[in-house]
Each structure stands twice: as C-alpha cells, then as structure tokens.
Amino acid sequence: MAKPNPEEFFDLGVKSIEAKDYIQAKKYFEKACDLKYGGGCGNLGVLYQNGQGVEKDLTKAAYFYSKACDLKEGLGCFNLGALYYNGKGVEKDLIKAAYFYSKACDLKEGMGCGNLGVLYYNGDGVKRDSKKADQYFSKACKLGNQEACEALKEK
C-alpha cells in the first residue's frame, strides 16, 4: 500500500475548491495538514477565514495559519500577520504582525515583504525607518508584488 502523499491531498483539495466543493476540500486539506504539509494547513485557515465549507471562525483560521507558518509556508505566515494587524481572531498586535510578515518575507512571500515595508514606512509595530521600508518594498517587488513596485516608483 502506497504511503499517503500530502501533496496529492493538497492538489485534490485545490481541485475541490475550483469545483466549489468546500466540504470535500476541507477533508483533503485536513489530511495534508495532518501529514505536516503547510499548504494544507494554510488552506484550512482560508476556509475558516472565509466560512467556506465550515462555519466562519477566525480563531481557527489563526490556528491553522500558525501551523502552516510553523511548517515554513510563507502564505500562512502572511495571513497570520494580517490577522494580528487587523485584530481578527486574535488580539490586535502590530509587533506580532511585523514578526509574521518578516517570517513570510524570509520565506519569499512577496506580500509579507510589502506589508512589512508599509509597517516600517508608517512606524507601526516597528521603529519608523524609510530606508528599511524601501528595502522591503524592493524585495517584495522582486518577488512579484506589484503594489510594492508602485510604492518604489512613487519615491
């Protein structure tokens, strides 16, 4: 008997989402997450954040994003940072938002770099530093974040 493949469960979950079968997607993502596949955990978080196939639950979304982030899934770190930034499902904490955006950026998630740049630009949760902001905008732009590219052009 072949060993369960978390990537296959993840791919089946994505196909289920494309078919708008969120209940089935949840089952596949749970299996992928149980097998320590960060994308599965992250997508479970998205289902809970959006209330797709499950009752909307931002606390559970934060839990699954945290699990995804621990498994080095950049988008999970980014999404967790966004929850902390907005105080959704967790207590608002700009320092934690900066931490998770930084972790996302380190994992080459362009949105994490871009949002970290905004925090440095505004001095939210970190000491205001326009030079660091530009460095993060530049990294985000190189990773395909168009908003960060625009922010650099405006300077």
Go through each PLM region and give its residues:
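Terminal, low-structured helical/coil segments at or just beyond the last alpha-helical repeat
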Residues: 1-6, 139-155
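Alpha-helix N-cap/N′ positions at the starts of helices
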Residues: 4-8, 24, 99
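Short helix-capping/linker turns of helical repeat alpha-solenoids
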Residues: 4-5, 16-17, 21, 35-38, ...
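Hydrophobic face of amphipathic alpha-helices that form TPR/SEL1-like repeat modules
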Residues: 8-18, 41-50, 79-86, 115-122, ...
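Short, charge-rich amphipathic alpha-helical segments embedded
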Residues: 30-43
